[in-house]
């Protein structure tokens, strides 16, 4: 028996035969052409054909996985028509006289490399989308057929990486699981596999060799392990694990509609962090009490310009309507650090993590910011909207935003547009400066969200991507817990609520501590909502002496 470890995408177990898929690699030659106009027409024809195909894929995906996941192919259409992407290809053909296939391949490679070098795993995973779009264009330019593997029954598809379009087009009835040598759990392919209910693991590395073609295997989507020719003992263990995990899922499902309340009556809100419409659907499906952070900056990628007011309005309206009266906290653009879209047109900074980001960026680009505020206030009539300002370090920033909101409201009234009068304005507390002045900020903010991801980095002077991060900066470090307590105390002293929307919010080993610190809300990825509810409902805080002693161990 051989076992290979990777990263789990979807928790389930699949048994089948390994089927290796190798997509044809294009042979691209760099050629100077004599008729660039003819070559450009070839590219335009390929682009138009690709857009039609993507429209068909969208329709197919919408029927099988829903509107949210089908948006993957809308994003691919947007990339093909992206002004910067299209302009680069056009320049290489018409001005530099290169062949169309080279122009597409070299431009796509540059875009993919740029994304792969970003710190954000989410943005790194978008490199696969660029490659998928590039392959689609090249197939049309070179007149190559789209070849998918001929699948046997009960196939576990093994490949280097899988493109979203390939995932969508394969015969799912014959597929038991996916296993890739590279890839990310945040890729569109991983999201599709998860929502199709297909067990998958990614990033297993080069140990996954073609020599295992046709071998019996079991894919453990819980631990992220592929077992090739497993022995009887391992099979029995995996069967038992599947039964146990299935029972756990069933019990978690029963928690839908229940309160997030401890055994002795302490209640805490559990909200969802989302980036896009797929995660919005997942938040609803997992019974989120609200949206704790909708990150709007991700709307700005793969675009020649910032989203216009109407696009934003419909996006925010959709989120508010989907949550059906529950609170939706929408963050204003958190541009900067590892999230710098091309449309931001920002000059290079020596240390972008500590540069013009968050609310600083918004206040420097007031016209862009006011467009976002207008869209938010227009959407506010469709639900319970709260607006969150990222990277606030001083109360003066909130005061300036309030001045802009007064201007925006006056404009909307003049235009005869409606907006809600109960929109809350909150501050993201994610720097030591904001923590230490949270008593002052609380006098102007309607609520606090503690962004522990950045707060940890700035407190410990250590990048979260650093390999020694977990060893040097434990999640229950006294400094971090003291900061959380200070923010909560200052919030409550001023009659407002304080929540946590960083990664540690979803850690059930810290849930009891957060309750003892008087945290009002935890906002997590949608898949963590029900496990966190289970953790809350198993806790009892009745003994104040014990709670005080527990806190002393940390504070």
List the model feature ranges, each with a label:
Residues 249-555:
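Conserved alpha/beta-domain cores
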Residues 40, 47, 51, 69-73, ...:
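Alpha-helix initiation and N-capping motif
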Residues 1-142:
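Conserved, well-structured core domains of diverse proteins
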Residues 113-151, 219-242, 441-473:
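N-terminal-biased segments
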Residues 52, 56-63, 67, 85, ...:
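Intrinsically disordered or highly flexible coil/loop and linker segments, enriched in small
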Residues 2-28, 139-142, 149-154, 158-285:
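Acidic, glycine-rich flexible loop/linker segments
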Residues 47, 51, 191-194, 284, ...:
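Residues within alpha-helical segments
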Residues 135, 191, 314-317:
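Residues on a specific face of well-ordered alpha-helices
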